[in-house]
Amino acid sequence: MGEDRRSLRVDYDDNFLRNNICSLKVSFIKQQGGAEGVKRLYADLGLALVALIWGSTFPVVKIALDSMSPFAFNTVRFFIACLFFLPFLKGWDFKDGFKIGIASFLGYTFQTVGLDYTTATNAGFITSTYVVLAPIISWLVYKDVFDKRDVSGVLLAFVGFYFLSGYSGFNIGDILMLFCALFFGAEIAMISHYSRLSNPTMLAFWQSFAIFILSAPFAVFTTTKFEINTTVILCLLITAFFATFVAKMLQNWLQSYTKSSDAAVILSLEGVFAHLFSVAVLAEILTPVQYFGAFLILLAVIIVSLRV
C-alpha cells in the first residue's frame, strides 16, 4: 500500500512538472507573438552569434598577418572555405555569385591590408558602416527606394569615423577600412538584388571562390612572408570555417526568419564584439573620444537600419 502511494505521488509529481513546463512553453510562445515570433527570436539570437563570430576575426586576422602577407592569407582562407561549401553545391551557375565576389574581394583586400595599419577595434567599427552605405548604393545602382534619413546616417557615421580616428588626422589603416566598408556595402546591395533569383548557398560559394581566384595572382607577386605555424593554421581554420562557411550559412538561413532591419542592427554588433575581443586578446584600449566616435557609428547604423 505504501509503495502504491509512493508510485502515485511520483506519477503526480511527474504530471505536475510536465504540465508546468507545457504552460511555460505556451506562455513563452504567446509572449513572443506566436510560433513565428519564437522563430524570429531564435533567428535574432543566431544572427547575434554570427556577429560575435565576425567580430572575433579582427584580432585573429591581425595576429595571422604577423606571419603571412594579406593576399596570401586571403588566398588560403577562401580556398579552404570553398572546400567546406562543395558538399552543399546544387549546380554550377556562377555568374551572379562571381559578380558579388568581385566586390567581396575588394572589401576583404582593403580590410586585410588595412589591419596592418590600424587597430582591430577601429577596423571592426569602421567596417560596420557598410550597413549605412548599402542603402545609398542600392539607390544609386538598382534604383531601390531611398530614405532621406539614410543621408543623416551617412553623415553621422562620418562624424563618428572622424572621432574614432583620433580627430588629429586620418591614418592610412582607417582610410583603407572606409574603402572596405564601401565595397562591403556594395556586396550587401548586390546580395539583396541577386538573392531573389539565386540560391544563397551558391552565391556564398562563388563569392568565396572569386575572392580566392582574384587574390591568388596578387599573392604570387606581393607575398613577403609566408610562415606556416600552429597559430596561422588556427587563424585560417577560424576564419575559413567559422567566419566564412558557418557564418554565411547561418546568415543566409536565419535572415529568412527575421526582419531585415532587425538583422542589420544585430549584425552591426560586429564592431562591438571586435572591440571586446581586441581588448581581451590584444589589450587594445580606446580613448574617451574614440569611444564617442564608436558610439556615433553604432548610432548611425541603428538609425539607418530601423529608419528612426
Swiss-Prot record:
Chain ranges of the EamA domain: 52-166, 178-306
A Pfam family this chain is assigned to: EamA
Compartment(s) of residence: Cell membrane
Membrane topology designation: Multi-pass membrane protein
Keyword Transport on entry: yes
Ranges in coiled-coil conformation: none
Keywords per UniProt: Cell membrane, Membrane, Repeat, Transmembrane, Transmembrane helix, Transport
Cellular component annotations (GO), alphabetically ordered: plasma membrane
Keyword match Metal-binding: no
Transmembrane segments: 45-65, 69-89, 100-120, 122-142, 151-171, 172-192, 201-221, 226-246, 263-283, 285-305
Superkingdom: Archaea
Family of this protein: Belongs to the EamA transporter family.
Name of this protein: Uncharacterized transporter AF_0788
Organism per entry: Archaeoglobus fulgidus (strain ATCC 49558 / DSM 4304 / JCM 9628 / NBRC 100126 / VC-16)
